[in-house]
Amino acid sequence: MSHSLAEHYHEILVGIGENPQREGLLDTPRRAAKAMQYLCNGYAQDLHEVVNGALFESENDEMIVVRDIELYSLCEHHMLPFIGKAHVAYLPTGRVLGLSKVARVVDMFARRLQIQENLTRQIAYAVQEVTDAAGVGVVIEAKHMCMMMRGVEKQNSVMISSVMLGAFRDAPSTRHEFLNLIGRHN
């Protein structure tokens, strides 16, 4: 854990008028620094190391969907969490990605300061890169604490973002099948 990061959290406590020496806050700077490093550990990860060769030969050329992948990220504007789920689909062309690796790719990009729109795009292009799929579709649904806890304070709003590549973009029937499979009927 970065000692300087803990020192910055100490200064934040002072800056908001708290006493970092009171009993409940004595270890808070260290704990907050450790938590932030964990929440941003995606910067230290490499896509090909995350996938770790988990690509398997397959004759399947039908859609593969992994839906409801929980995700937690921090918005780059306020450093507040957004929490939701990702739905990832692709059309394989001879190779399929290990199931857990789809979730790990989501986590790798979610564990960075980001906006949801970019997160959606990064996941889609990463899956495309490692699988060489005929198409990739990603939909993310998330609640943003920066909108719930401050600003307009809207508790029930959900942001939905999507990125469609290849056949998911070019073929309405492929896109429609994906959206039906994840319960997003259009």
UniProtKB/Swiss-Prot annotation:
Record-level Gene Ontology MF annotations: GTP binding; GTP cyclohydrolase I activity; zinc ion binding
UniProt similarity note: Belongs to the GTP cyclohydrolase I family.
PANTHER family to which the protein is assigned, alphabetical: GTP CYCLOHYDROLASE 1, GTP CYCLOHYDROLASE I
A single cellular component GO annotation: cytoplasm
Keyword presence, Hydrolase: yes
Membrane-spanning residues: none
Record keywords, A-Z: GTP-binding, Hydrolase, Nucleotide-binding, One-carbon metabolism
Organism: Pseudomonas putida (strain ATCC 47054 / DSM 6125 / CFBP 8728 / NCIMB 11950 / KT2440)
Record field: catalytic activity: GTP + H2O = 7,8-dihydroneopterin 3'-triphosphate + formate + H(+)
Pathway this chain belongs to: Cofactor biosynthesis; 7,8-dihydroneopterin triphosphate biosynthesis; 7,8-dihydroneopterin triphosphate from GTP: step 1/1
Known partners and oligomeric status: Homomer.
InterPro entries: GTP-CH-I_C/QueF (IPR043133), GTP-CH-I_N (IPR043134), GTP_CycHdrlase_I (IPR001474), GTP_CycHdrlase_I_CS (IPR018234), GTP_CycHdrlase_I_dom (IPR020602)
UniProt keyword annotation of Nucleotide-binding present: yes
Gene Ontology biological process: one-carbon metabolic process; tetrahydrobiopterin biosynthetic process; tetrahydrofolate biosynthetic process
Protein's recorded name: GTP cyclohydrolase 1 2
Record-listed E.C. numbers: 3.5.4.16
Lineage top rank: taxon: Bacteria
NCBIfam families, per database record: folE, PRK09347.1-2, PRK09347.1-3
